[in-house]
């Protein structure tokens, strides 16, 4: 497992190679502000080999945040992360490993009949109640997450996962009422609190796509205030003093900056903009005005939540082109480096993930960290 002393030792090994605030606080110690993502690529042995080499190169070069998910590449991404960690010269205590559960995974390759596979492997075996499945493959019920967490530990060949995300919980809102989804999440938070107390995970979070960057009236909106309230209730039920909901993940890049620009969340209690209703009961907060809401990044910062950004270079699209007016404000020798530095410059962001399915990309992406990020005022000025 990652430790405070291990992650700080990793940071110290690189001396002054990187720019200001390249390493940032993240439980239990520090992590790089550029992380390696493992979403892209076909589920093949050849891509496994590329990822293995890329992860090894990243760990050697100054990236100690590795992000994956059980459904990525039919469980192959988790397995290759485990292989690379086992072979790396970096100590396990130096590396923050995060994974996710929510989408039922295939095993090694996509089956000819995905629906039949889900039925035979998960429904017929009583792992998942079909009534809780949304869009045929997504469930956030505690029994399902418990099973997926165990499988992730096995795939990664680890005793502990440093950060475990409930994966795209807003998917449930496509077929279920918000109150029911919040109830399911609270039950799953209780499960994760027990797994945290048992030492199986360090902390937990919510990895999202829509939930925190859309307005409260949107179908897939989730309230951070409500989620934190539900996490506190889950911790109380388990007998834990402080809940373990410490991280959110959301997409953020030059062309998808909603987490900074969209007033999607209720103002935190005690702030000047706070309204009378935090949404603790699971309502969508439709009655709040824009003046009573803040962005997801601002809310997370005020609430003490770490933010990890995904799609930092837009699945490579932004490696080719950034609007000239924005590029002029960003440090970096290449467009990809500028895109990475935009994401990790946003106020409140801890780490920006970049998919690195090939070792050829590692040197360029890591080198983005040798440039200082924008200060808060300079970042704000981009949007003026």
PLM-predicted stretches and their roles:
Residues 36, 58, 66, 81, ...:
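Conserved, mostly hydrophobic/aromatic
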Residues 54, 140-153, 188-191:
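Short, well-ordered amphipathic alpha-helical segments that serve as non-catalytic structural scaffolds
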Residues 37-50, 129-147, 174-181, 325-331:
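Active-site mouth loops of central-metabolism enzymes
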Residues 116-134, 269-284:
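A solvent-exposed, charged loop/short amphipathic helix patch at secondary-structure junctions
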Residues 2-22, 49-50, 55-57, 73-74, ...:
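Beta/alpha (TIM)-barrel catalytic core signal, keyed to glycine-rich beta->alpha loops juxtaposed to Asp/Glu
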Residues 144-164, 237-240:
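CE4/NodB-like, metal-dependent polysaccharide N-deacetylase domain
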Residues 29-34, 61-64, 89-95, 158-162, ...:
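Short, well-ordered coil/turn segments that N-cap beta-strands
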Residues 1-120, 127, 193-197, 383:
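N-terminal binding-site loop/beta-alpha segment at the start of enzyme catalytic domains
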